[in-house]
From Swiss-Prot:
InterPro entries: SfsA, SfsA_C, SfsA_N. It comes from Magnetococcus marinus (strain ATCC BAA-1437 / JCM 17883 / MC-1). It comes from the Bacteria. The gene is sfsA. One of its GO terms (molecular function) is DNA binding. This is Sugar fermentation stimulation protein homolog. PANTHER family: SUGAR FERMENTATION STIMULATION PROTEIN A. Gene3D superfamilies: 2.40.50.580, 3.40.1350.60. Belongs to the SfsA family.
Length: 232
């Protein structure tokens, strides 16, 4: 997907109150940008490092700027987690995720049990595949990892996928790594051991795991290639 308008370069000053980032534009002006990321962004907030912003002319928005990309060790990292589902929808429409090809149609934000899963794919014969998408930005050593903070919501989604499998459907947890500099993924057991254990249980009960990395530039971002993974 291409960004609708060219991104604006800036420099990171600070992130605070979870959804706010102060940055300095090229002309020296300091602005506050919306940070559409509920995680900790561990290892990604480097004072003075380049970042890239999108701008909205919508007068109803409280903040015109949104933090889209940061730099980590020279690599671009997509920190707008709200894009992950849009990236997957685009990839599904373009058949760029082979294990999720061949479906007649899909729905988004589908209620299931007491949760809501990101996608429900319907095969031509009617079989259902439920997919939950997780945006990954964390780098631990040379591996992509999830989560970057304790996530009770993530465990709830895994429980819904486990239930879907037991009900005779297909359940898939799809990790979208919004960076292109890493080749392997693992659960971040040192950050959230409960989630790592729940993920292993889910896989042992038939939930499928897919991990795909993105290709990123300051003009576009798209789902590009599968990554290897370990669960231990």
């Amino acid at each position: 997907m291409e960004y609708p308008t060219p991104l604006t370069p800036a420099r990171m000053v600070q992130r605070y109150k979870r959804f706010l980032s102060d940055v300095t534009l090229a002309d020296g002006t300091q602005v506050t940008a919306h940070c559409a990321n509920s995680g900790s962004m561990r290892g990604l907030v480097h004072v003075g490092e380049p970042v890239y912003l999108s701008h909205s002319d919508n007068p109803k928005r409280k903040l015109a700027w949104t933090l889209e990309l940061v730099c980590d060790g020279g690599a671009l990292v997509g920190v707008n987690t709200g894009l992950a589902n849009a990236l997957v929808a685009e990839a599904l429409q373009q058949d760029r995720i082979p294990p999720l090809q061949g479906f007649a149609h899909f729905r988004r934000e589908v209620p299931y049990q007491d949760s809501r899963l990101d996608f429900c794919l319907t095969a031509p014969a009617g079989a259902l595949t439920y997919v939950e998408v997780k945006s990954v930005t964390l780098r631990l050593t040379d591996e992509a990892a999830f989560p970057d903070a304790v996530t009770k919501r993530g465990a709830k989604h895994l429980a819904a996928l486990r239930h879907a499998v037991k009900a005779g459907h297909r359940g898939v947890i799809l990790f979208i790594v919004q960076r292109s500099d890493l080749d392997h993924f693992r659960p971040a057991h040192e950050i959230d051991p409960g989630y790592a254990q729940t993920l292993q249980w889910a896989i042992s009960e038939g939930v499928e795991i897919l991990v795909y990395a993105c290709a990123l530039t300051t003009a576009s971002i798209y789902v590009e290639r599968p990554l290897s993974y370990t669960l231990g």
